[in-house]
Amino acid sequence: RQWFAVQQTPTEPIRAVKLGGRLGCVSACRHHELWVPHDRDLHVAMNPGRALPVKPPAGVQFHRLSTPCATAVLPLEDAVAQVVQRHDVETGLIVLESAVNSGRLHPGDARHILKGLPARKARAAQFFSPLAESGSETRLRLFFQRRRIPVQPQARIPGVGRVDLLVGRSWIVEADSTAPHSARLDER
């Protein structure tokens, strides 16, 4: 099979195909314009039966696919599932919730991805929230949830409006900035 790239083709999918695979995992999620934590490596998904390099090039991580992929970039849902399965819980939830928040992944599909997790990661499902609007919110919410501190994402507070996180009964946390909420504050 031969591949052809037009001049506007981004470099990451081209590199992945030249390495014998497909753009996958975190790299594919970035290509699909999801918010992903900082990761400089190129993640290459290899079709079943394809040999993995004995010594991968520096800055490249290879992942084995269970079913073949015919495109140069893994479909969004498959790429998100790879991140959730292969990375730490925090990274997986950040990417999963980014996909849901962007409207590119239905919350039911996100829950389906979480159901497929191995037992050692299954607890992550209890922390999933379709309400997170940024990776920073997911990261902070998860920090409190892991410590069993009550936290409510996107809470509505009378006289204030919607806040990123309500921790306990009275602590308000704005994860990213006040910009999304400042218009409401200016009206008071």
Predicted segment positions?
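Short gly/ser-rich loop at a beta-strand->alpha-helix junction or flexible surface loop bordering the NTP-binding
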Residues: 1-119
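Surface segments flanking catalytic/ligand-binding clefts of nucleic-acid enzymes
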Residues: 100-188
